[in-house]
Amino acid sequence: MPRIRRGLLWGAGLGAAALLGAGLYLYFMGTSAMLEQAEALAFRRMAVSQLPEQGVFRFFYATNRVPIDEQGSLEGRFGSERAASLSFGAFDTRIEPTLGLGMLINPSDWFLNEEIKLERLRTLEREQLVKELRAQVEASPHRSLLMVVHGFREAHPSALRKTAFLAHVLDIDTPVMLFDWPGDQGSSLRGYRRARDVARASGAELAATLELVIREVQPDRLWLMANSMGGQVVVDAFHILYRDADFADSPTEIENLVLTAADVDHAEFNNRFKEEMKALANNVTVYVSSNDRALLVSRLINRGQRLGESTLDPRNPSQAAQAAELAELMEPRDERLVLVDVTPVNRTRNFHNFSLETPEFFNDLFLRFTDTELPETRELYFLETPERVRYYVLTRGR
């Protein structure tokens, strides 16, 4: 009998301990979650895009997709065909304040969860877009505008969500506008080649969008960011804008152009784009990575090195020579064109999405947009080739 009683007492004690542990866990975890949410709400710079309803932000888009039903569901509004004209709109997005880089668990569906919810989409006429966008620009502390161009395989709904996520994590008090081109041409080799052709053709509509922004919205500071094959859209847009005497002469119209993991052919970038870039952009930053597996596949398909692919390693002289080849378009001591290797900090799953998943990248990007000079940070190191061409390496620090 004492043995049974002792067993019952032990069982009761263990049960009480388990309940106490569970209670403490829920208490502290709940408190931690509440503190994180309160902190996220307290420390947020995005004010100009914020709507009166807490946690809802307004962004804008221009697209050259063929409209299907612009008043229908999100998935059914635009197709994957290119139109030689533009459609405009605004999208109001609810963003949970605790959403962060560490929450990228499943890249195939994380944008569809409750952290980023598209609450309202409106089609805008050109004049209304200019009016609403200009109002945000004039209310922003920098009188700035960030334009975003996404890359290969991006559908319209995910392009909207990724733009909202980018604005949230970058957290600059600036209006944000998406240029959405039909990059969703399929995942096969044929789809990739078809998307590359569409990207080249879409340069015309991006050029028209940039001209609209520069002439009518008139931000003091215009920032243009393109990822992956979106870089090809930018290159072809610059080809078109450069033919206009107003854009070909000084001063430059774009303060900062940023290309991340750019899927752009080196020869085209070096030959034509170099002079066009000087005329149109005051600063150009190209983020590259040697472990960008997606671009290695692109290289095999295109039988040439793509712009986003790097082999930088300061401990390896042969790789330094390859870096010099990549930097052929740079002039000695050139500070307008900056090459940044993110290999040491690129921890992403397919090594191609560092522009959405790497904290050090966002820290560096924030400084490049908000500062007027080249940033100097503890994580950023610069190297120089024997020909005095400078490039940068972004590290995790010490």
Please place each PLM-identified region on the residue numbering.
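N-terminal Sec-pathway targeting helices
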Residues: 1-19, 24
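Lipolytic serine-hydrolase domain surface
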Residues: 25-122, 131-140, 160, 164, ...
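Alpha/beta-hydrolase fold active-site loops
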Residues: 143-144
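The conserved beta1-alpha1 loop
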Residues: 147-151, 261
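Histidine-centered active-site/metal-ligand motif
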Residues: 150, 227, 352-353
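Short substrate-entry loop that stabilizes the transition state in hydrolases
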Residues: 154-159
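Gly/Ala-rich beta-loop-alpha elbow adjacent to hydrolase catalytic centers
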Residues: 206, 226, 230, 234
